[in-house]
Amino acid sequence: MDRLLASLDDAPIVDKDGYEYLVHPISNGVPMLDPALLREVVIEVMQTADLNVDKIVAPEAMGIHLATAVSLQTDIPLVVIRKREYGLEGEVSLHQETGYSESEMYINDVEPGDRVVIIDDMLSTGGTLASICTALDDIGADISDIVVVMRKVGPSALDDTEFDATSLIDITVEDGEVVVH
């Protein structure tokens, strides 16, 4: 995790209407994502996650590159929860709220009884993951694990659910700096 920890030293923090937003290659794709950093993170996700599953589930947008790499290494099919509705049979919509926005997302190709692992870049306010977990639970999927690269320490909407996420690292943003816990 040396590369990930070092990359946080230079990560800019921007104010989005009072919300301290971390800008990082893993969670934003900017600055440019070094393949060695991506490789390190993906290997750690694979060592951490319960991968005895039928499908990997990742929310658009920044969970996609992580989950794609895990899917390629494990041959586990990937389901992307999209921000666009396609109107396909069985499509399930969910409403997500983050610290700085809210929108609809759409799940396709998850069936009752599917064992899934959710992989994402960041757990901050927990709004996205809480909504995804509720929707997957309503579908009848079995959420075997939730793994995020970074978790902002503090209250999260996920706290109000039965689901827990495992993070590779826990952080806070204090006075415009990232602090690793």
From Swiss-Prot:
Gene3D superfamilies reported in the protein's UniProt record: 3.40.50.2020
Q: Name one GO biological process term.
A: purine ribonucleoside salvage
Top EC class for this record = transferase
Q: Which domain of life is it from?
A: Archaea
Keyword Protein biosynthesis on entry: no
Look up the EC number in the record and give it.
2.4.2.-
Q: Spell out the Pfam families in the cross-references.
A: Pribosyltran
Alphabetic keyword roster: Purine salvage, Transferase
Q: Which GO terms describe its molecular function?
A: transferase activity
Return the PANTHER family for the record.
HYPOXANTHINE/GUANINE PHOSPHORIBOSYLTRANSFERASE, XANTHINE PHOSPHORIBOSYLTRANSFERASE
Functional note: May catalyze a purine salvage reaction, the substrate is unknown.
The Swiss-Prot or TrEMBL record describes its family as follows: Belongs to the purine/pyrimidine phosphoribosyltransferase family. Archaeal HPRT subfamily.
**Listed name of the protein:** HGPRTase-like protein 2
The organism encoding this protein is Natrialba magadii (strain ATCC 43099 / DSM 3394 / CCM 3739 / CIP 104546 / IAM 13178 / JCM 8861 / NBRC 102185 / NCIMB 2190 / MS3)
Organism placement in taxonomy: Archaea, Methanobacteriati, Methanobacteriota, Stenosarchaea group, Halobacteria
